[in-house]
Amino acid sequence: MALGLLAGCSSVPLERSAMQPAQLLPLATLAPPVCAYRLDAVSDRRAAGTAAGSLGAHAFSLDDAADLVRQRLMANGFRDDPALPALSLEIRQLYIAANQSSKVPVAVYRVSVDGGPPTILRSHAASVNWNGTEAESQRAIARALDDVDLQLRQMLDARCGSRHAAD
């Protein structure tokens, strides 16, 4: 009897896998920006290194988050023109966590424009945890990145509008 109870306490080992950047590209295309910005620097400052959380029996890693975010932002209208205002971006967190009923993908950026004071942007993309599959996890991270990228665009567009009003 005791052996049967102990067997029920064993856990399934986590399947370790790397998130695929092709699965994390923008799910939605943003409207063109109000005014242009240069993507000066993207750095990966995640305290967890390449670890990107877990969902169900899957534990994830993401090796080159800075390149992924750079690709996503360049696809959404950032430029390499040195005459434009410069955006510096640090990736502070990028992972997925879950409980029985919901999954919480987290993306946190620390951004500054032209060396100004930094702003923290955090995704708000929690959703129902259906099956805990690898594909579901990657879609959730892509949605979190879409959310924080949209917040960044809105912040920059508002800054651009106030900059033009001062002219």
Residue ranges with predicted function:
Residues 9-67, 157-167:
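A structural "domain/chain start" motif
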Residues 69-77, 95-98, 152, 156-160:
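Sec/Tat-exported extracytoplasmic proteins
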Residues 47-59, 116-164:
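Short secondary-structure boundary motifs at beta->alpha junctions and helix caps
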Residues 1-10:
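Sec-dependent bacterial lipoprotein signal peptides
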Residues 3, 88, 92, 108, ...:
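A sequence-level detector of short, solvent-exposed, charge-rich linear segments
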